Amino acid sequence: MSGNEKEGLDASDSDFDPSDEDDEAVDAETETEAEQPADDAEEATEAEPTDDESEADEAAGPQLDEDVMPDEQSEADLLIPVEDYLGAGVHIGTQQKTQDMERFIHRVRTDGLYVLDVSMTDERIRTAADFLSNYEPEQILAASSRQYGRFPAEKFAEAIGARVRTGRFIPGTLTNPDYDGYIEPDIVVVTDPIGDAQAVKEAITVGIPVIAMCDSNNTTSNVDLVVPTNNKGRKALSVVYWLLANETLDRRGAEPTYGLDDFESDI
């Protein structure tokens, strides 16, 4: 399903049916030959802030930002209080903005940082949970190469029964049946389309959908469902993965057993 010129869900404004995924075309520019595990993973080419820089930004963010969503949006409709989103720095974007992410941006701060609309983050977490609840747990793959995304991605997978690959994504994991670590998931969740470019590329090759946590500097042409969020901050990623796990379990009729503290990694 990935590989559309625009984000899959929003390009058509239609509901996604997991049963249709085999009928979707694979991106013509994607390499289709089987890949062997190699020492050099594909390098991301987009410039982005480091995890440490984002951690510093999120620490300063809540004092500067109170206007993080449209006035007509009620705080009562959110999964958690808006103050909790603020405290985690979920709303803090980068100083770069792509056209793909413009619709998820609420405003720009005086220091040049873009502020993401947390009501859209909240909405997309629910939508992503709707999608994931249609899949068998073991057919969901969470992938995160980003430092602060690894621990919450592992906890997310543990909570919902999914598979997980953190750190360097070995080429051929989804495309080379001869590789010992080869797996065949039906959907992939990634922390960052830039850092997790190899996982996204292979998902496109095999024709499975991609849910991605995207910051203001991300492009989304190979993403089927965007969850707009600060995808570099430790606390922000913990909150988003925790909410996504709980909402997915809720739609399965299961009781969440993890608290936010369980998703927060040590610095």
UniProtKB/Swiss-Prot annotation:
GO terms for biological process: translation. The N-terminus is blocked. This is Small ribosomal subunit protein uS2. NCBIfam families: uS2_euk_arch. Keywords: Ribonucleoprotein, Ribosomal protein. Belongs to the universal ribosomal protein uS2 family. Residues 1-72 are annotated as: Disordered. GO terms for molecular function: structural constituent of ribosome. Residues 10-72 have a biased composition (Acidic residues). It comes from the Archaea. PANTHER family: 40S RIBOSOMAL PROTEIN SA (PTHR11489). GO terms for cellular component: small ribosomal subunit. InterPro entries: Ribosomal_uS2, Ribosomal_uS2_arc, Ribosomal_uS2_CS, Ribosomal_uS2_euk/arc, Ribosomal_uS2_flav_dom_sf.
